[in-house]
């Protein structure tokens, strides 16, 4: 019976992860293609759905623990899903941040060509997808490869920040737009960080090895 409930729980998590991934993809798509309707859909339709799923999963986990009092591996799995649930909801919030800044930017002239942000987003989306796959398949090799990708996203963020500081210094009229681009790049970076957190948890639950978090989660 518990095994059936755990499988049901994992299906709910996969649904939530799919929504989180879709929210990030749509927020970037709306920015690149300047499509207001896509961005508004992320904010007005997808976010409420994400919040519903987060609450549903949280209650499901709490009820499982109360009813079945799981031990050892099963308890660790439920606790990890609780944490992943929180991380995925935060990724949804970050996609909303991206969409809100994108809604501001698409109505104004571009500060710079959008080259690095789509690259950065592609890396982060792949990290998220692989993080969830590593959990489903208990694939620590895949989880470790995701952790290594985090540096790529960080480097792109630093490059974007340096460029935007140069733009703002030379032309103060770009400051407000540049700040929104910085907000987008930092949101993408946090998505990559949260995906890495998921992978660290996969490694712990599968191998029993604690991988120290490389960054604060502020």
What are these model-derived regions, one by one?
Residues 1-218:
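Cytosolic, long alpha-helical scaffolding segments
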